[in-house]
């Protein structure tokens, strides 16, 4: 997928040596060991760049991929999905990047509303998603074992994280859990959450091979230490 590197011309001009090394690895070699579709590869790449806080690289990849490998609606949902995991403080700049790229590409905004919940049913529908992904017994046990004074975090997970975002149209369950896995893997230091979302990926039908492929694709952006940590957790959960 060399075309994804088309907008990195400044590096090519000013540091052709690094340009050749990185292009060969990130846009050729890693793809030889991945079974992801082109769409999935772009989604996980964009997800990792959000979590890496790399808006310039995100913009360049988005310019090359929107309306070719991913739709504007999928990009919007990717960005929405990032908020409960990376936080709006980290996601904020990427909203501006997406607006600028869409404007340059002639994509009219705002896009169609994709919400499927109301203020009355968002918690119920969010809990249904939690139960589906992680098992009703596990979610209930988590709620029961949460100390007093902290149970509102479970309420936030039900309503905000899962109710407001996971229920939306635009990305399917497999895509949402895959990019969520990448958000968390990119961060590093969130091993318990990564374990949970490794299991969540398996529950919605993503395979161990797909998770390994996702880490393979994002390795050039997140580095070896975090990639190897993620592989260790994949192997632990999938053994």
List each model region and its residues.
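Extended hydrophobic/aromatic segments used for targeting, binding, or gating
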Residues: 196-198, 204-218
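Helix N-cap / loop-to-helix initiation motif
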Residues: 37, 70-74, 172, 205-209
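A short structural micro-motif
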Residues: 50, 68, 81-88, 185, ...
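Short, structured motif recognition centered on aromatic/hydrophobic residues
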Residues: 41-49, 78-79, 176-185, 194, ...
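Short, glycine/charged-rich beta-strand-loop motifs at protein surfaces that mediate ligand recognition
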Residues: 169, 182-188, 201
């Amino acid at each position: 997928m060399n075309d994804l590197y088309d907008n990195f011309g400044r590096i090519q001009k000013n540091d052709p040596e690094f340009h050749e090394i990185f292009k060969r690895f990130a846009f050729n070699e890693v793809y030889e060991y991945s079974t992801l579709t082109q769409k999935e590869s772009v989604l996980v790449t964009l997800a990792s760049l959000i979590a890496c806080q790399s808006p310039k690289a995100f913009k360049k990849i988005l310019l090359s991929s929107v309306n070719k490998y991913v739709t504007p609606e999928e990009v919007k949902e990717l960005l929405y999905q990032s908020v409960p995991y990376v936080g709006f403080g980290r996601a904020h700049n990427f909203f501006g990047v997406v607006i600028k790229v869409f404007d340059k590409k002639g994509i009219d905004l705002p896009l169609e509303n994709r919400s499927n919940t109301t203020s009355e049913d968002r918690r119920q529908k969010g809990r249904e998603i939690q139960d589906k992904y992680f098992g009703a017994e596990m979610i209930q046990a988590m709620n029961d074992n949460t100390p007093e004074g902290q149970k509102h975090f479970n309420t936030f997970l039900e309503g905000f994280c899962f109710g407001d975002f996971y229920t939306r149209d635009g990305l399917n369950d497999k895509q949402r859990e895959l990019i969520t896995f990448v958000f968390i893997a990119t961060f590093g230091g969130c091993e318990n959450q990564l374990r949970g979302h490794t299991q969540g990926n398996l529950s919605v039908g993503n395979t161990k091979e797909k998770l390994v492929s996702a880490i393979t694709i994002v390795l050039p952006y997140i580095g070896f230490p975090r990639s190897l940590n993620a592989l260790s957790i994949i192997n632990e959960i999938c053994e």
